[in-house]
């Protein structure tokens, strides 16, 4: 095992790249053991373009399987190995947005028993023994039910993994640090202001339309400039979900809203002691302060 081990718990394929792709690539390139745990196949996602449009849930319902391939390619671009799905690929179904028919599906991730989900993540933590775990904030970044569920059960699992709870899930392992992945408001605004020409059909975001958190909430900033090419390639690998602009500095989801590809990724430390801080009072290393 590497002396630095990182586990990122995400809801759907592409989530790992959108907010943490640079961090994954940076630590993988630095020799850390980086694992991505994905909880659903993203079956309820919309699809960009006509080529794969009939894969959606209301037609062939084959999008989830297709997205396994996209995730596999994206993780390869980031240097993070093969995908890992909670309790196996397809065990839980993408819930879609709150109030939709998909959210009422008994197999939807949002309807799964939370204690069982917590136990499953505890088992992964005890197997992989990560020093650092990354997941979403309580709002799941933008309110998606699966993201909120991931936040809830991952937080519970990190707390339980080092205890005597869930004795059938392996030997206890204490996670040193837990982070939320977020986007700093001022960095997002600066990135939007730098957007130049965008592809036909795209538009700039309205003020406050893209999720972000106040600058004061951010505890940790990871410089990902050296691995932006890997992040761009990983974004492009999720071709049913993401389009990277020809400039390489913006991308859009199926809503055609231009979003900047930022040179830094942002986190909030919510468990464990902070490491060395810079002049702005922020960590620059997820593993800072951890004795190996």
Swiss-Prot record:
* Gene Ontology biological-process annotations: mycothiol biosynthetic process
The record describes how the cofactor is bound as: Binds 1 zinc ion per subunit.
Give the InterPro entries listed for this entry.
Answer: GlcNAc_PI_deacetylase-related, LmbE-like_dom_sf, Mycothiol_biosynthesis_MshB
Question: Which cofactors, if any, are listed as required?
Answer: Zn(2+)
Q: Does the keyword Zinc apply?
A: yes
Q: Which UniProt keywords apply?
A: Hydrolase, Metal-binding, Zinc
| Top-rank lineage group of the source organism | Bacteria
Reactions catalysed, semicolon-separated, are:
1D-myo-inositol 2-acetamido-2-deoxy-alpha-D-glucopyranoside + H2O = 1D-myo-inositol 2-amino-2-deoxy-alpha-D-glucopyranoside + acetate
Q: Name one Pfam family in it.
A: PIG-L
* One GO molecular-function entry: zinc ion binding
Where does the chain bind Zn(2+)?
12, 15, 147
E.C. code: 3.5.1.103
Q: What does this protein do?
A: Catalyzes the deacetylation of 1D-myo-inositol 2-acetamido-2-deoxy-alpha-D-glucopyranoside (GlcNAc-Ins) in the mycothiol biosynthesis pathway.
Concerning its family, UniProt says: Belongs to the MshB deacetylase family.
> HAMAP family under this entry?
MshB (MF_01696)
In its UniProt entry, what is this protein called?
1D-myo-inositol 2-acetamido-2-deoxy-alpha-D-glucopyranoside deacetylase
Organism whose genome encodes this protein: Rhodococcus jostii (strain RHA1)
């Amino acid at each position: 095992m590497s002396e630095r081990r990182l586990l990122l718990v995400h809801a759907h394929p592409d989530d790992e790249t959108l907010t943490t792709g640079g961090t994954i690539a940076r630590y993988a390139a630095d020799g850390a053991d980086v694992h991505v745990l994905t909880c659903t196949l993203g079956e309820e996602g919309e699809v960009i373009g006509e080529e794969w449009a009939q894969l959606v849930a209301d037609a062939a319902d084959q999008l989830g399987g297709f997205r396994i391939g996209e995730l596999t390619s994206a993780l390869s671009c980031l240097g993070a190995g093969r995908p890992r799905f909670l309790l196996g690929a397809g065990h839980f179904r993408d819930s879609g947005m709150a109030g939709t028919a998909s959210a009422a599906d008994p197999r939807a991730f949002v309807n799964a028993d939370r204690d069982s989900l917590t136990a499953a993540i505890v088992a992964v933590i005890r197997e992989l023994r990560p020093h650092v775990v990354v997941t979403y904030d309580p709002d799941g970044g933008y309110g998606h039910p699966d993201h909120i569920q991931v936040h809830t059960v991952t937080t519970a699992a990190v707390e339980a993994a080092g205890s005597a709870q869930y004795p059938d899930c392996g030997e206890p392992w204490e996670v040193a640090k837990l982070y939320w992945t977020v986007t700093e408001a001022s960095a997002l605004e600066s990135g939007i202001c730098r957007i130049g020409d965008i592809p036909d059909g795209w538009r700039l975001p309205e003020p406050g339309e893209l999720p972000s958190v106040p600058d004061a909430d951010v505890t940790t900033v990871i410089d990902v400039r050296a691995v932006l090419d890997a992040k761009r390639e990983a974004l492009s690998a999720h071709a049913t979900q993401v389009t990277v602009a020809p400039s390489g500095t913006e991308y859009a989801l199926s809503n055609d809203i231009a979003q900047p590809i930022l040179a830094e990724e942002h986190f909030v430390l919510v468990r464990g002691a902070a490491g060395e801080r810079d002049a702005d009072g922020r960590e620059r290393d997820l593993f800072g302060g951890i004795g190996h």
